């Protein structure tokens, strides 16, 4: 299963996706990930290895870059199953991999989730 959040803000407002956010000045990537997951889901996690690195560029109606994110996806382990959505998420759910289509998760996110599944299978 995988943890999904329904985005409260743009980009992708209302869409189900993996938890994440912005790195604050002076913050390490691992610390930013742990903080964002805690803020969005109420979960404390053990940050594991990098699964994938993806560029996300979104253009406005005039063809100008509106958003450009470099997304680094990690495999994490949660210390508990109890979740509660925070201020950046409308909802948070544990979702079986077989049910991802019900949540209209993007193809890129599904690909990352599949990579994470394989990586987790090979971890002690």
PLM features per residue range, with description:
Residues 54-82:
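Active-site-adjacent beta-strand/loop module that shapes the phosphate/pyrophosphate-binding cleft
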Residues 18-51, 74:
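The catalytic Nudix box helix
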Residues 117-124:
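Generic C-terminal helix-cap and adjacent flexible tail
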Residues 11, 65-67, 88-89:
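A short beta-loop-beta micro-motif enriched in histidine and acidic residues
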Residues 73-75, 84-116:
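NUDIX/MutT-family hydrolases
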């Amino acid at each position: 299963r995988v943890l999904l959040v329904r985005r409260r803000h743009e980009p992708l407002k209302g869409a189900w996706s993996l938890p994440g956010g912005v790195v604050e000045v002076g913050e390490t990537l691992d610390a930013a990930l742990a903080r964002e997951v805690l803020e969005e889901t109420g979960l404390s996690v053990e940050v594991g290895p990098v699964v994938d690195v993806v560029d996300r560029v979104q253009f406005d109606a005039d063809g100008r870059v509106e958003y450009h994110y470099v997304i680094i996806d990690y495999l994490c382990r949660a210390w508990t199953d109890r979740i509660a959505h925070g201020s950046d998420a409308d909802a948070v759910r544990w979702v079986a991999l077989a049910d991802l289509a019900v949540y209209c998760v993007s193809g890129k996110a599904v690909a990352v989730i599949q990579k994470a599944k394989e990586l987790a299978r090979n971890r002690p």
